[in-house]
Amino acid sequence: MAFLRKVNQVLLLLLVLTLCGILYKKVHKGAVLKDKADVDSESPEDMEEEIPVVICAAAGRMGAAMAAINSIYSNTDANLVFYVVGLRSTLPRIRKWIEHSKLREINFKIVEFNPTVLKGKIRPDSSRPELLQPLNFVRFYLPLLVHQHEKVIYLDDDVIVQGDIQELYDTTLALGHAAAFSDDCDLPSAQDIHRLVGLQNTYMGYLDYRKKTIKDLGISPSTCSFNPGVIVANMTEWKHQRITKQLEKWMQKNVEENLYSSSLGGGVATSPMLIVFHGKYSTINPLWHIRHLGWNPDARYSEHFLQEAKLLHWNGRHKPWDFPSVHNDLWESWFVPDPAGIFKLHHNR
């Protein structure tokens, strides 16, 4: 009897230990799952949305990109990540400029653009050879350079942002639209500027309507053009509509047929986008793309108008870091000196 009693006691002890083990595992597992669930449920609410801004930093005008970045970062509290795109030879210099200047606090990623993707897609003849530089076509390849974002802002390097970039990012893109641009016809004070510097703002200025391929598009030559120097893009739609492939198709057609007008000298990258996005893009608030500051050194906007502008764009030959140029004081206030001493301002010659 004593032996059986001891056996029963041992079995009872083992049973109690087993039950305790099972109970511990359940409680511990439940706590772990609860913690994980809490993290998963809280993170989307607590995590501030990241705004990706893509900007190119070309070797000869790297100071432009740094000034643009400085103006964007200084005028917002938004959570930004800058994708600074360059050719392989310039990447160390880009990093040094950022890390050894006031820009060291920004969140950034340096992205290499491989120009071999452009082989056979660019005609060598242009009235403005600088527009044939590989980085001018980075905007065609946004989904290949930025992978983890649904919505992306692309900016030319010769811009200064005076508003909160969050406003531009909040631009509504209509269903089925892969991008938003600013129309050339809805720019405040645009008519005065166009008359003054002789600019065109229609497809006629970019496409050669003498060519059958252009005529067959059925696009009226008087259709208002847009400027792709400021883009808000939906990456899902861009990939779904195979925008990059479409743009490459029209680049190759131009190589074969010389389809684009050289009258403005700016149709190299703009013209394919005008064709691919015709009637299929949303619009940006005009104040978020005040342009033509670089077309004529004698053409000036009013100071009041410039103060209202959210973004200034010196598109054209006359850049604000060079001479002659206009409104360069607005640009120079955001200039970040080159730690290597290579990029210099040339305002007084």
Swiss-Prot record:
Record topological domains on the Cytoplasmic side:
1-6
InterPro entries recorded for this chain? Glyco_trans_8, Glycosyltrans_8_dom-fam, Nucleotide-diphossugar_trans
Locate the transmembrane regions by residue number.
7-24
Q: What is this enzyme's EC?
A: 2.4.1.-
Glycosylated sites: N234
Topology relative to the lipid bilayer, per the entry, is: Single-pass type II membrane protein
Instruction: Indicate what this protein is called per its UniProt record.
Output: Glycosyltransferase 8 domain-containing protein 2
| Species this chain originates from | Mus musculus (Mouse)
Whichever gene encodes this chain, its name is Glt8d2
